[in-house]
A protein has these predicted regions:
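Bacterial N-terminal signal peptides that target proteins for export
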Residues: 1-7
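HIT superfamily nucleotide-processing domains
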Residues: 18-183
Length: 183
């Protein structure tokens, strides 16, 4: 029983380390010494790529997500990077590129998601692209005509988007929208 008790204490002590939360991100491309942190790896990846196109696509390196792509903007804002730091034309181009990649890979079964800051493991803004899981739809969404109409998430919030006929359903206030996508 004593060993079990110590294991429980250790697990509780380590629990905060298992949380994904980039609200205190320090990644700054102008200060190379800040870029060594694990949560800065997508920033480093983007900096190592050609300046064009403005959105680049990489496979998710998490071995538990073999079916996922990530859309990375060339944009570097303040840390942690959020969509609200981008201009409306930058956001529209970014959403459009992610949706196009989703359609290319998954046809009409695509879904895209951006996790909230408390659930993100990377400081660099990124959109998860995957196949929408069956049964994911819920009643908490807004209908928009296209990428230009996708609302900007409130500070730190996440969202997920999928096709609905010739419109899009945007599910807001979703901390971990990527869970609606095939891993």
């Amino acid at each position: 029983v004593s060993t079990l008790r110590w294991f429980a204490i250790l697990a509780l002590w380590l629990l905060p380390l298992s949380r994904a939360d980039v609200r205190a991100c320090l990644c700054d491309v102008a200060r190379p010494e800040t870029m060594a942190a694990r949560e800065c790896s997508l920033c480093r990846d983007v900096e190592a790529m050609p300046a064009e196109p403005q959105t680049v696509f990489v496979r998710d390196t998490n071995p538990n997500k073999p079916n996922r792509w990530l859309a990375l903007p060339r944009f570097h804002g303040k840390s942690p990077q959020q969509l609200l730091d981008m201009t409306a034309p930058e956001r529209t181009a970014y959403w459009s590129a992610a949706i196009a990649k989703g359609r290319e890979v998954w046809g009409d079964e695509w879904g895209i998601a951006m996790n909230g800051l408390e659930k993100r493991t990377q400081c660099h803004a990124h959109i998860h692209i995957g196949k929408l899981l069956e049964g994911s739809e819920n009643d908490h969404f807004v209908v928009v005509d296209g990428p230009a109409d996708i609302p900007v998430p409130r500070d730190g919030d996440g969202l997920w988007v999928h096709p609905a006929g010739d419109k899009l359903h945007v599910h807001t206030d979703e901390p971990a929208g990527e869970l609606k996508l095939l891993r």
